[in-house]
A protein has these predicted regions:
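Conserved beta-loop-beta/alpha segment of the NTase-like Rossmann-fold superfamily
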Residues: 1-58, 63, 102-104
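Catalytic-core segments of class I nucleotidyltransferases/pyrophosphorylases
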Residues: 12, 32-36, 65-142, 146-160
Length: 160
């Protein structure tokens, strides 16, 4: 539904189940800067190194630098992850993401999965990059009741 409002503009998508705070440069600003420096990238992902990848989309990456990865493949909640990075729910997309969303089948709960559209973008030969979260970035997950309570407690500490 949002395609008609985006038209030919690039866009940032931020999932509603995680808030990210930063003591320095916010990841959204880093995504935008990375997009300006890499205008041929169709998608730029934000990734975080995690111990348990079972709740995340996971990228298979090639290191360009310690600040930038090329994404070779993405899989949602893989049984055998190809990296220890999780895709965080803040994305930079060129508007062609909509054509790839239109090429994929609906998944669980009849929803289109961004991970599937990102993989389709890669399969069609488009460049997908990722930047890592920094040590000064904090993500607060509100996807489960336990993580929601933790996020409330942590955000209260953050502002006081």
């Amino acid at each position: 539904r949002s395609e008609k409002y985006v038209a030919n503009d690039d866009l940032i998508v931020h999932g509603g189940d995680v808030s990210i705070f930063s003591k320095k440069i916010h990841p959204i600003n880093r995504l935008i800067k990375t997009a300006k420096l890499n205008p041929n990238a169709s998608i730029i992902l934000l990734c975080k190194k995690v111990k348990d990848t079972s709740r995340y989309g996971v990228p298979k990456i090639s290191l360009i630098s310690k600040e930038l990865f090329e994404v070779d493949e993405v899989v949602e909640k893989p049984s055998k992850p190809k990296s220890s990075y999780a895709i965080m729910p803040i994305y930079f997309f060129k508007p062609e993401i909509f054509s790839y969303l239109n090429k994929i089948k609906r998944g669980k709960n009849n929803e289109l999965q961004l991970t599937d559209a990102i993989q389709k973008t890669i399969e069609y030969g488009n460049k997908v990059l990722a930047i890592p979260m920094k040590s000064y970035d904090v993500d607060l997950d509100v996807g489960t009741p336990e993580s929601y309570k933790h996020a409330l407690d942590a955000s209260y500490k953050w502002i006081h």
